[in-house]
From Swiss-Prot:
Descriptive protein name: Odontogenesis-associated phosphoprotein
GO CC annotation, single: extracellular region
Function, as annotated: May promote nucleation of hydroxyapatite.
Organism for this UniProt entry: Rattus norvegicus (Rat)
Primary location: secreted
Amino acid sequence: MAPGFHFSWLLVSWLVVTTVKGQDVMTPPGSQNNVNPTDCQIITLTPPPTTRNQLTRAQPVTRTPTFYFPPRRPGFYPRFPNIPFFPPNNRRFQLWPFYPPRGRLIPWRFFLGRRQLQSSSSEESLE
């Protein structure tokens, strides 16, 4: 069992049964519990609360404020990069994954190798 609060089902069931039945809790021997619940008279020392006049209502706001919040300054909106964020000096991630940029007009989209960029041997060389 996981460490933590342990309780007894017997204690919980006894507490539920005594609460439902409305019985008195077990009295220690030698003590007397012969008080009738209707013996005492409840006397309130505070006066009853005053009732409000029916004409007293919430007053409507007649003047509307011109603006609620101050105007926003031109802010700095950082873009989320499409690479994962790795904190510096992190030993778990030695190799950083490479994510090529997305888009149509990237320089190496159609020229992927060096062989395509070099001139062919059939061309005449300028001397």
